[in-house]
Amino acid sequence: MGDRIYRFRQMMVTAVMIVFGLTVLSACTKEDSQDRVTAISDAVWSFSQANPDGFTLDIRSMSVPKEGIAVSYAATQGSHSREKLDFVVRHALQHDGYVGGWLNKENGLYYFDSTRLFPEDKLADALKFGKDNGQTSAFILSLQADVPIEGKVAEIVERGTLLVGTTGDYRPLSFCEPTGRYWGFGIEMEEEIARRLGVGISFVKTSWPTLSNDVLSDPQTFDFAIGGITITDARRETMLMSDGYLANGKTILCRAADSEKYKSLADINRPEVVVMVNPGGLNQKFANENLPNATIKVHDKNEEIPSLVAEGQADVMITEITEAPYYVNNDSRLAAPLLDQPFTHGEIGVLMRKGQDDVLQMVNAVISKMKEDGSLRRLHDKYGLVYAF
């Protein structure tokens, strides 16, 4: 009997607390709402003065979310005064609880919007909401990147698949197995970009001789290209290239038994030395420009050249410091005696056509984030590559 009375009393206390809480909430929303809005608006206004580069703020806790996709409501668009900030805050309290702000440097006015925050794997939903609300972009907080509502990135997201061009012949950056499965450092880079976009990924075969034409083809066969593509001024004249995600430089592969023969380019630049290269890429260009006296042979399939060198059908392969260690570690007949003294110094990046600035911004944002959070270094370690950033 005593236990039942105790439980009844506890239920009554709980009920009274709930009723009291609802009454207080009602009083706050009806009687004190303007005081609350004013207090929050004052805090947001002060916060904005210290953050001229823009922000997204959870006004319920006055905290800054580090992840999410921020999109503004049309109802609060164009609010740029302390008085209008009250309207924005009131709208935010009635909806999602987020306020975004940014300084228009052209007119010196700070603009505020009630904002919805989407999970970062819901970019398609965020872009649709933005389009329905007459917005021009969505902002990915973790990447600090704007995604235009209308653009190439939006097209990829709507399609649901990222199309990536790659030669598939460049271990360990991009290689296609006979089964059709692609693997490699560059492949994992693009998988991360696709994950950030919330889409699937499909690889499209290209080749070194046709790479530039394939990137520039109309209609496009893929969105951009990866896999051992060195950043050069010549490529940037006609196409866009991302920031570098891998250091690179020209070196050689030779038979291990001959490794003492080759100490410099001069040792290779002789008629009796047969140098083999793949066609159409920078390896062939380097050989033609720097080894005029050597006997240069062109072989169509890049991935077959190391074995041909090991078998004696060529003496030297012009390759890169990203590729050479893979073959040396997997074939004891081969050596890379000048690996620590590359003939050139450069970086590898993502190649795309001009006009896709939104794609370039997105790719660069992912690369920057991977450098910042250590995932790019871990990917280097996985493939035995030297991290130089």
Residue ranges and their predicted role:
Residues 159-184:
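Short glycine-rich His-centered loop
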Residues 187, 191, 195, 200-267, ...:
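Acidic, polar ligand-binding/catalytic clefts
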Residues 152, 282-297, 335-340, 367-389:
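Ligand-binding clefts/hinges and TM-proximal coupling segments of bilobed small-molecule sensing domains
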Residues 163, 198-200, 217-227, 272-274, ...:
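Alpha-to-beta junction loops
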Residues 210-213, 228-236, 285-289, 310-344:
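A ligand-binding cleft/hinge motif common to bilobed small-molecule-binding domains
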Residues 246-254, 321-368, 386-389:
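Periplasmic-binding protein-like
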Residues 24-27:
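C-terminal motif of bacterial Sec signal peptides marking the signal peptidase cleavage site
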Residues 166-170, 204-209, 220-232, 255, ...:
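Beta->alpha turn/N-cap motifs
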